From Swiss-Prot:
Lineage: Eukaryota, Fungi, Dikarya, Ascomycota, Pezizomycotina
Task performed by this protein: Probable component of the endoplasmic reticulum-associated degradation (ERAD) pathway.
Family (UniProt): Belongs to the LCL2 family.
One GO BP: ERAD pathway
Highest taxon in the source lineage: Eukaryota
Classification via PANTHER family: LONG CHRONOLOGICAL LIFESPAN PROTEIN 2
UniProt keyword terms in alphabetical order: Signal
Presence of keyword 4Fe-4S: no
Organism in which the protein naturally occurs: Pyrenophora tritici-repentis (strain Pt-1C-BFP)
InterPro entries per record: LCL2
Signal peptide: 1-22
Keyword Iron: no
UniProt protein name: Long chronological lifespan protein 2
Cystine residue pairs: none
Amino acid sequence: MTNPTILLTTVLLTLLTTPALAQFGFFDQMFGGGGGQQQGHHHHHEQEAQNVRSDASWYQSQYEGAQCTHYLCPGTLSCVHFPHHCPCSWETVEDKVELGEGIAVCGSKGGWVEGEFGKKVEMARKGLL
């Protein structure tokens, strides 16, 4: 028969150390792991995806290689008939407002009121913002 104090201590230690071990696993995954690696353990490195270039050459090559017989939108590389027909880059979170004379701008939807961006643009045009 085991002593109840020893059993209780063992159970409490197990319960207290399990979340700590889980947290260290979380930090290993978040920060790339291997920080506390000991010799003898083998760490398999997967080939990491390469970041896109930090200069404009990739974009320029995409722009120059795009096939478009009308107007090629610089922000989305969409082919449209007129510049003000260009879609917003992030249509799910942006609204487009046409300013007239073939000019259109995109801005955050705001999230509260339908057409909020358009109303703000109109207020700014009137000098109220």
